[in-house]
Amino acid sequence: MKPSPRTPAHPRHPVALATFLVFGLAQAATAADDALLAAAPAGQHTLQAVTVTATMTEQEARTAPASVTVVTEEELAQRNAANLLDAVRGTPGVTFQGRQVGGRKTLALRGMEGKHTLTLIDGRRISASDDVIGHSDYQYGWLPMAAVERVEIIRGPLSALYGSEALGGVINLITKKPKDRWMASIGLSGATGLDSDTAADALRTSVYAAGPLGEQFNLAINAEKSYQGSTVLPEDRAQSEIEGNRTRSLGLTASWQPVAGHEVEFGVQDGLEKRDSDDINRTPTYYHNRYELDRTQKHASWNADWGNGWRSQLRAYRSDISIRNFRNNGVAATRPQDMRDSVVDGHASTRWGSHQITVGGEWRKEELVNAGLKNGQDEATHKALFVQDEFALGQNLMATLGLRGDHHEIFGSEVSPRAYLVWEASPNLVVKGGYGHAFKAPTLKQISPNYVGAEGPHSFLGNGNIQPETSNAFELGANWQAAPQLALRATVFHTEVKQLITYRLLQKIGPRSIYQYDNVDAARIQGLEAGFTWDITPRLQWNNDATWLHTRDKTTGQQLNDRPRVAWNSTLVWQVQQWRTQLGAETTGKQQSASGELPAYTLWNASVGRAWKLGGERQLHLSTGIQNLGNVRMQEESPNFGWAEQGRRFFVNARMDF
C-alpha cells in the first residue's frame, strides 16, 4: 500500500519567520560589534565589477557593450553554491526549465532554452551535452566552485565572438589565479534537511592552493569531494523525487613566464560524478538507476604582451565527457555515450588610434560515440574567423562592431554580425543597446542521416538536410545612479528565432511513434528587465530585479512553454563591517507547460555570514542560513512541474584562507 501524500508544510508566515531569523541574528551580531566597529559607508564594500567575456578584453561591466551580471566569490559562498546552477540563480533574466527526470533542471536566459546558452571556463567552451543527451543537465558540474573567482553572465547573443550555442547568452566561469605569494583555502560545507521527506543532507569539502615556484613558475591546485543525498517521492516512497550524487574533482594548472609579458600555461581539470535514484518504468518495474559522468578538460595556452598595445593569445584544449548508465531488476540501461570537443583558437588585439581591433580564429572538431550512429560514431569540423572593432564616435560614445564567419563541414556556413553602442551620458547615466545575430549548429545526432535513437517508447531519426537554429536580437537599456543611495536599471529586448529544431511525426508502427528531427518552428521572445539597488541606510541595502516575458510560437500562435511571464528576485542585505546578513525571495510567475498552466511560486532564503582576521593573511569565513524557508514543493504546487527543488534546509559554510 502506498503512503498518503504528506500535508503541505508551508508556514503561514514565511516572511515573518525569515525576517526574525535574519535580522534577529544581525541585531545580535551588531550589538556585539558596535562597541568596536563603526558602520561601513554605503557602497564601501562594493568594487566595480569587471568582465572579459563581452569583448575578450577586460572592462567595467557598467560600460561593457552587453547586458552583464557578475557573481562574486563572496556571493557564491552566501548562496551555498554547489554548482553553476546554484551560482546563477536569482540573477536577472535567469529562470529554470525541467528535464522530467530525477528533479533535474536547466537554466534559461531571457526565455531562451539551456541549449542556447554557451558555457565557458576562462573562455574555453565545454561539451554542449544538454541538447545531445535526453533529460540531461550535465553542463553545470565541470568546475568546483572552490576554484571560481567570479561568474560572468552575458544576456543576449554573442555568436559574433564565440560562434555556435550563444543565442541566449554566454556564462563564463573565471577561475582564481596565482598571486605573487602562496595562498590557500580549505572549505567545508554541510546542509541538513529540516523535513526528511523533501530535503536531503549534503556535505562538501574543498581545497584550493596557488602560488609561485621560483621567479618564473606558478602553480594552482583545486580539489573537491561532495555528497548530496536523494529525496523520496512522498506519493510513492519506493521512488526518488530528486536524485542523489557523489562527486570528486581535481584540477592542476602550471604556468611559466619565460620573458616579461609572456606566459605559457598548461592545465587539466578532471571530475567524476555518480548519480543515484530509485525509479519505475512503464511495465511497471521498480529499479535502481545509476549514472556515472566522467568529465575532463585539458588545455595549453600562450598569452603574450608584445608592447605598443599588441596582445595575443593562442590556445589548444580538449573537453571530454563520458556517460554510463546502470540499472537492475532486468531493466535495460541507456546506451553509453562519449563526447569530445577538440579546439585550437587564437586572437590578437591592438590599438590603432581610437580603435581597439581584435581578430581571431577557431578550429573545432566535435566527436560523438553512440550506438545509434552509423559505425557507432560521427564527427564534424567547424572553422571560424572573426573581427571586432571598438572605437569612439565621440567623447562619451563608444561603438563595437563585430563579424564572425563559421563553416560547418555538413550544413555549410553561417555569418554572425554584431553592432553595439554605449553612451556615457553623464557620470551617473549609461545608455546602451545594439543588435546581434546568433546561431546554434545541429547536434551530430540531429544532422547525421543514419542516426536512429530507439531506446525509449519512440524512435528518433537524424536528418542530413537540417539547418542551424538562428536568432536576430535587439536590446536597449540604461543604468542610472539616480541618487547616491539609489541606482536604477532597465533593458528592453526583442528576439526573433528561426529554424528551431524539433521533431515531426513520420509514422506510427503499433504503439511506437517514429519521429525525425527537422527545422519546423519559429518564435518571438520579447520583454523587459528592470531593477534597482537602494541603500536604505548606510548598513541596509535592497536589491530588486524583475523580468517580464512575452513569448509566441509563430507556427502555432501559442505562448511558448516553460517561460514564466514574470520572474522577480528581491534581496535585503544588512552589511556591518565583516557581517553580511541577507534575506532573499525568488518569485517565478505563471507559465504554460505542455500539460497546462503552472502556478506562480516563491522561494525564500536567509543567511548570515562573517569574516574574521586571525593575524597575518589568515582569515576565517563563516556563513549559515536556511534555504527554501517556506518548504515549497513543486509537485504540491502543480503535478505538471518538470523538476523539483530541495525542501527547507539548514546549511553552514566554513572557509579558512591563509
Map each language-model feature to its residues.
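Extracytoplasmic beta-strand/coil segments of soluble accessory domains associated
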Residues: 53, 85-128
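Conserved C-terminal beta-signal and adjacent last beta-strands/turns
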Residues: 8, 16, 20, 47, ...
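Gram-negative outer-membrane beta-barrel transporters
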Residues: 187, 392-396, 493-496, 516-592, ...
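Surface-exposed extracellular loop regions of Gram-negative outer-membrane beta-barrel proteins
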Residues: 272-274, 372-376, 409-414, 423, ...
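Short acidic/polar hinge/loop motifs at secondary-structure boundaries
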Residues: 125-155
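Outer-membrane beta-barrel signature, preferentially recognizing the C-terminal barrel domain
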Residues: 283-305, 337-340, 424, 437-489, ...
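N-terminal periplasmic accessory domains that precede
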Residues: 84-87, 105-108, 119-120, 137-141, ...
